[in-house]
Amino acid sequence: DSRGFEWIYPLQTIDNEVTKTYFFRWDTTKCPQKTIPILMKEISAMKDIKKITILGHSYGGILSSLLLNEIEAIETEIHVIAAPLGSSDLKKYCGYDHQTSKNNNVSYYQWRTIKKLDYAFNSFDYDPQLIDFKESIVVRLPREYRGKRLGHLWSISWVADNINLD
């Protein structure tokens, strides 16, 4: 358990003078659907925001994907990184099914690791990142990042270095 340390470099990278950056920590021992009202309350409280960009990693990507039909009034980009969107366990224990549509104001990006290099997923007999959702842009991450294996935790740093936050 990295206890969130994998977010330090990415947050330092994307936080700048023109970007207001927030970190939302939630109870990952609970099903993600239970957290949506709390997160929507936080998003709704933001004033004078023209656009929001949400990055969710791993299980946080599941939480982020549940916002596809929730956010209506603000231009939104949702980026899910190394997220087990097709997890049979989440379906079994939480009743989670990935959304089948999204609001028109929402752009959706999936950043997928290479399963055999991702130690969170390489023991699965399927790739839990794979879903059939035509309204998303899918980016397959490379094998290496800064000369090292690009696995589950490094994926956030790679995205922070390569995402366009305009």
Where are the regions a protein language model picked out?
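Short, surface-exposed "cap/lid" segments of acyl-processing enzymes
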Residues: 1-18
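Serine-dependent carboxylesterase/thioesterase catalytic core
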Residues: 2, 21, 26, 33-118
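Hydrophobic transmembrane signal anchors and adjacent membrane-proximal interface regions, especially
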Residues: 5-9, 76, 137-139, 156
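Short, glycine/acidic-enriched capping/hinge loops at junctions between secondary-structure elements
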Residues: 6-8, 34, 121-122
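Charged/polar, solvent-exposed surface patches and flexible loops
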Residues: 9-13, 41, 157-162
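Short, acidic/turn-prone active-site loops that include or flank metal/cofactor-
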Residues: 26-27, 136
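C-terminal catalytic-base region of ester-bond hydrolases, centering on the histidine
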Residues: 96-166
